[in-house]
Structure formats: structure tokens, C-alpha cells
Amino acid sequence: MKTIIYSPGDPAGIGPDLFLSLLNEDFFRLIKANVVCLGDKNLFESRASELGYDLTFDFFSNIDDLQDKIGYLEILKCPDVSSGILNSVNSEYVINNLDYGIDSCLQNKNTGLVTGPISKENLVEGGYIFSGHTERI
């Protein structure tokens, strides 16, 4: 079965909200693929609460454990899960999620990557050289 990995981008932005909104609308049940969202458990639980969504989360420690499901894979803890406030302390979290998604696609031809919005300025402020998703991929 094919797998779609979603790297939600900056935790302060709309990326996590987009995924949660689609999950809340049961959109992913229509897709004939495993769907994996990369991210911190606390981030998604707190954001779902902010949005008023009553969702159940399945977190996995290994992408290979996901079979015919929608799940979350926590690569790294997010230092600041505040919505709407950019914080460069999250730069490593954002880059690690993106790089994990890229590496997974390179290792498995049945895996696709969808990326959420990233603040380039915030990543540079966090110490990373980053000019965009396309260049990094």
C-alpha cells in the first residue's frame, strides 16, 4: 500500500490546522493510502482542542507499524507548541520532520511527501540555511 507523509511545517502556522481539519472531516478515509503526519503529540492534541475537534490520535514510533491507518509519527518533541507565534526554537523540529519525510520518500518509491508552510525567515533565525522546500528536496 502507498503511504503519504505530511510534514506540517511550522508548528505556529496553519499546517497542523490543515491536517486536523481534514482529519475532522474524515477526508483521509477516502484516500487509498496510509497517511502519516509527522509531529509532536502535544502539538496536535493541544491544537485539536483549540480548534474544538474531538479527535483520537494514533501515534507510532515506526512508520512500518502503520498498516491501513491514519497515524502520527513523533520524530522530535516540539519545544513551543503555541499557535500563531513564530519561535525560532522550533527550527530543528521543523527541519527534522521535513528531512525525515524526504528520506522516507528516497528509501521507498511507494511513499509521497506533502509539505506544510514553513517560515524561511524563522528557520534562518534558528541557524539553518534554508531557501525553500524545493531546494532542500
Predicted regions and their residues:
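Contiguous, glycine/small-aliphatic-enriched amphipathic segments in soluble metabolic enzymes
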Residues: 1-136
